[in-house]
Regions:
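Short, solvent-exposed recognition patches
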Residues: 53, 57-147, 151-152
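Alpha-helix boundary/capping residues
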Residues: 21, 111-112, 188
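Solvent-exposed, acidic/flexible segments
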Residues: 42-49, 88-91, 101-104, 170-178
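A short, solvent-exposed beta-edge/loop patch
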Residues: 39, 127-192
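Sec-dependent signal peptide hydrophobic core
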Residues: 13-23
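N-terminal secretory signal peptides that target proteins for export/translocation
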Residues: 1-11
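C-terminal motif of bacterial Sec signal peptides marking the signal peptidase cleavage site
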Residues: 27-30
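N-terminal "mature-domain start" segment
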Residues: 32-85, 178-192
Length: 192
């Protein structure tokens, strides 16, 4: 009868095996599909096109309200609505149109900051652009029961400027908002 002795790894072979497994794990983790900041839609970009409200309305965007721009310096149009892509969830947007990309950046940025983000001004008494302020609010709060969801917070976590358009895009965080701004930009310029 032949006796079989178990194979024993020598220390150098075991060290080599552990090193190779560690390197493989690092390489696989490094090539993961997680999103990075490079994948985010840029907050300010200029495709070289001056868009009109009619071009926005020609996308899957559905207008719910058209706002007066009297309190919105430099804006020629302002609209609130939603867009649904491929039968998915609808996302709310506030779109503000300016004469140029530079006007959108110079005049639109302060007002976009006022209407979006964790420091958004959501009170008519304090806001500069009062038109549609209720559309920029959302009910927040966790838990169950009627009183658990009683806070008011910003519907738009951030904004993006795409050409001459300032977009406030629905999202609970800046990354989600920018992703949804990217959906609108892609609807305007499908090759973007």
């Amino acid at each position: 009868m032949i006796s079989k002795t178990p194979k024993v790894f020598s220390v150098p072979n075991l060290t080599l095996l552990i090193t190779l497994l560690t390197i493989s794990t690092i390489l696989i983790a490094g090539c993961g599909s997680g999103s990075s900041e490079d994948d985010l839609f840029p907050q300010i970009s200029d495709p070289g096109t001056v868009f009109t409200l009619d071009e926005v309305l020609a996308t899957p965007y559905k207008e719910l309200n058209n706002y007066s721009t009297d309190e919105l310096p430099g804006a020629t149009e302002a609209t609130y609505g939603f867009m649904r892509i491929g039968g998915g969830e609808p996302y709310d947007y506030e779109i503000r149109v300016y004469d140029s990309h530079q006007a959108a950046v110079d005049q639109g940025t302060p007002m976009a900051l006022e209407g979006s983000g964790e420091n958004a001004i959501l009170s008519e008494d304090d806001a500069t652009f009062k038109e549609g302020i209720k559309d920029r609010r959302t009910i927040i709060g966790g838990g169950t029961g009627g009183g658990a969801r009683s806070g008011i917070g910003p519907k738009f976590a951030t904004y993006a400027i795409f050409g001459n358009i300032v977009m406030l895009c629905q999202g609970s965080d800046a990354e989600t908002s920018l992703e949804r701004c990217g959906l609108m930009a892609n609807a305007l310029v499908p090759s973007e």
